[in-house]
Design a protein with these regions (language model features):
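Long, contiguous, secondary-structure-rich segments that constitute the structural scaffold
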Residues: 44-60, 64-207
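Long, low-complexity segments enriched in small/aliphatic residues
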Residues: 1-47
Length: 207
């Protein structure tokens, strides 16, 4: 049925399958993910210079969305979908379409992974939108569960999720949520003493 309906030789617009089963009044925004050019998962994430530039990600939103939802640039906010929610920091950008929010994915990591300490920005401020995306569509009226994927290629529908955003409470911790227990060291993986790179030699009392 999917191939018969959507596998057309000419491109045409159709409403994403997940959106048809989502309350778009409650979840009015489209959420997208991109990748920073310099880093993806472990690729280049151990470069000390790059980590100073972008050691964690933000949720980029239009200033109009922030004004409508009562939060400012740099605030901690919640981004919520029908499947889950994430607490993160926001960043205003006029380049973001008001009906859309987006972030760099693959920067948020659990403490302990790749030698990151519990104080690392990746673990305390970085986040993933994966927690908001389901592998299955909401059940139909008959209770049927269908894969949340492109109807033709089968690619996971990462760009189809709908969300809402709102300001985090003043008493909430200034760390991303959800948080996970630090990953244990693997056998033979010992703690290493940190070493400064050459470009910071002479700082912090180091000669």
């Amino acid at each position: 049925k999917r191939i018969e309906t959507y596998f057309d030789p000419l491109p045409f617009y159709y409403e994403p399958l997940e959106v048809r089963l989502t309350d778009t009044q409650r979840y009015p925004l489209n959420a997208l993910t991109q990748r920073p050019m310099a880093m993806y998962h472990s690729w280049d994430s151990q470069n000390a210079w790059l980590r100073q530039i972008h050691s964690h990600n933000y949720l980029f939103v239009s200033p109009r969305v922030g004004a409508a939802n009562g939060f400012d640039d740099g605030d901690w906010i919640w981004v919520e979908s029908p499947h889950g929610k994430v607490r993160c920091m926001c960043r205003f950008s006029e380049a973001v379409e008001p009906g859309t929010v987006w972030t760099w994915n693959a920067i948020g990591k659990a403490a302990g992974s790749w030698g990151l300490t519990a104080r690392a920005d990746e673990a305390r401020k970085g986040f993933l939108l994966n927690h908001l995306i389901s592998e299955e569509l909401p059940p139909t009226e008959c209770g049927e569960h269908v894969s949340n994927s492109d109807p033709v290629t089968g690619q996971a529908a990462w760009f189809d999720v709908r969300v809402r955003v709102y300001k985090a409470g003043p008493d909430e911790p200034k760390v991303t949520s959800p948080q996970f227990s630090p990953m244990p060291l693997l056998p033979g993986q010992g703690k290493r003493r940190g070493r400064w790179q050459a470009y910071v030699a002479g700082l912090f009392g180091q000669k």
